């Protein structure tokens, strides 16, 4: 079994998946196709057409509310079920019974999240909303940074709660005072983190929330 904890994970930025866009992506050690229909709905399916195995993300196009296979133009709906076979008067019963695996998706915080569970369970919780991201007073021209790091996701989580290294690695003035609380899958932390700068020590605070393994937000004051 793939050693990835279940939860919501960011798979794209909302503004980078326009109406009609089709992307070949790979998450959770699987190939997927991510697309936005003509009505604006986002869907992420397993990548391969059940008909003859063509990759829907390479040459596939959006047709209305479906993604059209590049091989025989079979059209698959956002729920993974067959929508249309253009050259067939009737859809064969076997095709009607076929369903491409669909990842639950949600758009929030100007991001596209997909739900992963190793056994295909439906989402156990909701994605959080972080008001600063869509608040006009904070602006809408956010910088985006992406890093590819070769480590297990558990290493990232453990680093976040390792307050002892802050003073030696990040320049915190002293060992930070911190508090951690839990609520179901959510983890909240608050800590004082005075920073040493060329102009002297600056008092600071860091607070954050982890809503499962792939939905995290940190505030610096």
List PLM regions with ranges.
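Well-ordered beta-strand positions in beta-sheet-rich domains
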Residues: 8, 102, 144-146
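Rieske [2Fe-2S] iron-sulfur-binding domain
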Residues: 12-133
């Amino acid at each position: 079994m793939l050693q990835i904890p279940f939860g919501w994970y960011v798979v794209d930025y909302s503004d980078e998946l326009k109406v009609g866009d089709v992307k070949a992506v790979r998450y959770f050690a699987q190939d997927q196709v991510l697309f936005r229909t003509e009505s604006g709905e986002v869907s992420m399916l397993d990548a391969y057409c059940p008909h003859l195995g063509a990759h829907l993300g390479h040459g596939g196009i959006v047709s209305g509310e479906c993604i059209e296979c590049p091989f025989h133009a079979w059209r698959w709906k956002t729920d993974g079920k067959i929508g249309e076979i253009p050259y067939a008067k009737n859809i064969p019963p076997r095709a009607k019974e076929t369903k491409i695996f669909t990842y639950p998706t949600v758009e929030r915080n100007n991001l596209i999240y997909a739900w992963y569970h190793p056994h295909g369970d439906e989402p156990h919780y909701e994605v959080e909303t972080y008001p600063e991201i869509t608040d006009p007073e904070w602006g809408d021209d956010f910088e985006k940074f992406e890093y590819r790091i070769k480590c297990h996701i558990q290493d990232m989580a453990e680093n976040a709660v390792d307050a002892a290294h802050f003073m030696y690695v990040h320049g915190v003035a002293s060992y930070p005072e911190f508090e951690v609380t839990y609520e179901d899958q959510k983890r909240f932390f608050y800590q004082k983190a005075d920073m040493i700068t060329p102009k002297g020590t600056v008092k600071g605070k860091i607070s954050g929330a982890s809503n499962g393994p792939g939905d995290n937000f940190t505030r610096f004051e």
